[in-house]
């Protein structure tokens, strides 16, 4: 029962945007930069950071479901450790959205529920499949973060610092999942994941 209460609290905090980071925000060492951007640039960056915030909401749901369904204690611990770092990402993105005068996606409850269901299915398929799903997810997230870094205005050093640290963490999570025995996913599954990601990013940029 205590575990269920704890996991329910994690879900509520992720959806509500009340997550706190354990690590310092990478942007804290940089000066404020929103005044150096035009209104259009701020709207664009806010859209990108809202996408990244949604991605971290989904990451919380995925890791939570996969942690609950893991057979092996070491795999469960690995999922939990990665989820804690993803909480940092979630808090950093939320803070940056506030700096930009924007807000998280209104569809966060939907994103969370969908990601939890996917993570549960992956977890029930076995630890190797679950780890493979983590590895592929992180590979796609790494690619998507690289695209966002290319699309940031040159003056936006704070978002850049956050996304660069997030990308480094995602690469490490993916490598760890592969090293722990994650199996490669079939091409149709990878394509389906990319399609779902496109739907999410298109909607989250605006809503």
Curated annotation (Swiss-Prot):
Pfam families: COQ7. Binds 2 iron ions per subunit. Keywords: Cell membrane, Iron, Membrane, Metal-binding, Monooxygenase, Oxidoreductase, Ubiquinone biosynthesis. Its main location: membrane. GO terms for molecular function: 3-demethoxyubiquinol 3-hydroxylase activity; metal ion binding. The keyword Hydrolase does not apply. It is an enzyme of class 1 (oxidoreductase). It catalyses: a 5-methoxy-2-methyl-3-(all-trans-polyprenyl)benzene-1,4-diol + AH2 + O2 = a 3-demethylubiquinol + A + H2O. Its EC number is 1.14.99.60. It is found in: Cell membrane. SUPFAM superfamilies: Ferritin-like (SSF47240). Fe cation 2 binds at residues 86, 138, 170, 173. Fe cation 1 binds at residues 56, 86, 89, 170. GO terms for cellular component: plasma membrane. It is a peripheral membrane protein. Its cofactor is Fe cation. GO terms for biological process: ubiquinone biosynthetic process. Pathway: Cofactor biosynthesis; ubiquinone biosynthesis. Belongs to the COQ7 family. Catalyzes the hydroxylation of 2-nonaprenyl-3-methyl-6-methoxy-1,4-benzoquinol during ubiquinone biosynthesis. This is 3-demethoxyubiquinol 3-hydroxylase. It comes from Cupriavidus taiwanensis (strain DSM 17343 / BCRC 17206 / CCUG 44338 / CIP 107171 / LMG 19424 / R1).
């Amino acid at each position: 029962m205590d575990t269920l209460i704890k996991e329910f609290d994690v879900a509520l905090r992720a959806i509500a945007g009340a997550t706190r980071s354990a690590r310092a925000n990478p942007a804290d060492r940089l000066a404020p930069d929103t005044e150096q951007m035009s209104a259009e640039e701020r709207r664009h960056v806010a859209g990108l950071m809202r996408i990244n915030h949604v991605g971290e909401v989904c990451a919380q749901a995925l890791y939570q479901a996969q942690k609950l369904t893991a057979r092996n204690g070491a795999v469960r611990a690995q999922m939990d450790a990665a989820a804690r770092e993803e909480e940092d990402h979630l808090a950093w993105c939320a803070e940056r959205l506030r700096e930009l005068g924007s807000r998280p996606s209104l569809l966060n409850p939907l994103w969370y529920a969908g990601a939890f269901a996917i993570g549960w299915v992956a977890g029930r398929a076995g630890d190797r499949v679950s780890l493979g799903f983590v590895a592929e997810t992180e590979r796609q997230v790494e690619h998507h973060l690289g695209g966002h870094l290319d699309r940031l205005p040159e003056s936006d050093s704070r978002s850049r610092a956050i996304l660069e640290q997030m990308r480094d963490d995602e690469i490490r999570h993916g490598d760890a999942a592969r090293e722990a025995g994650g199996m490669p996913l079939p091409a149709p599954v990878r394509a389906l994941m990319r399609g779902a990601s496109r739907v999410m990013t298109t909607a989250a940029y605006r809503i």
